[in-house]
């Protein structure tokens, strides 16, 4: 019974959510589109012609926004453990990003080139138990950062969803070694009760740049 009440409450909140209604009106697949749009309005992260990887892409809200902004000369590779309906000119890699085979497929799609931007809205299925949820969430953050380190061009950018809790401070410390500037963003469209926020990382230093920083 308690579970049914919780589910009903979630459904009521979801359908009364102004961003859900706005997404339906504007043709976006997810309310999450507005999180990226808010960051874009503030930081001008995405530009025409860019090469971008979108992690945790399904159902496609961020990919819709990104594809429109990069235009026909850009390139977008999206990936998620869930299926995603196709978006024109978007390469989709379906599978569990924690598996090496999926990483290999993404790297194959990237090819010998580098990308300008990696964005990650990945999050685990939450149990409500911080001792379980935080390690899972931080593991996904670490994997996203690992990919960014492999594929970003020097000067490239990285946007990643994070959660405050155990492991965050160490992650934040490490990421600051790799980028010239790291800022926190909490879009208005994030739900009030959510502990999520985003780290906006500008100016990838490259592996050599990070190693040089480590020496000082």
From Swiss-Prot:
It holds the Pfam family FtsJ. GO terms for cellular component: cytoplasm. S-adenosyl-L-methionine binds at residues 60, 62, 80, 96, 121. GO terms for molecular function: rRNA (uridine-2'-O-)-methyltransferase activity. InterPro entries: RNA_methyltr_RlmE, RNA_MeTrfase_FtsJ_dom, rRNA-MeTfrase_E, SAM-dependent_MTases_sf. The active site is at residue 161. It comes from the Bacteria. It catalyses: uridine(2552) in 23S rRNA + S-adenosyl-L-methionine = 2'-O-methyluridine(2552) in 23S rRNA + S-adenosyl-L-homocysteine + H(+). Its main location: cytoplasm. It is found in: Cytoplasm. Keywords: Cytoplasm, Methyltransferase, rRNA processing, S-adenosyl-L-methionine, Transferase. Its EC number is 2.1.1.166. Specifically methylates the uridine in position 2552 of 23S rRNA at the 2'-O position of the ribose in the fully assembled 50S ribosomal subunit. Belongs to the class I-like SAM-binding methyltransferase superfamily. RNA methyltransferase RlmE family. This is Ribosomal RNA large subunit methyltransferase E. It comes from Pseudomonas fluorescens (strain SBW25).
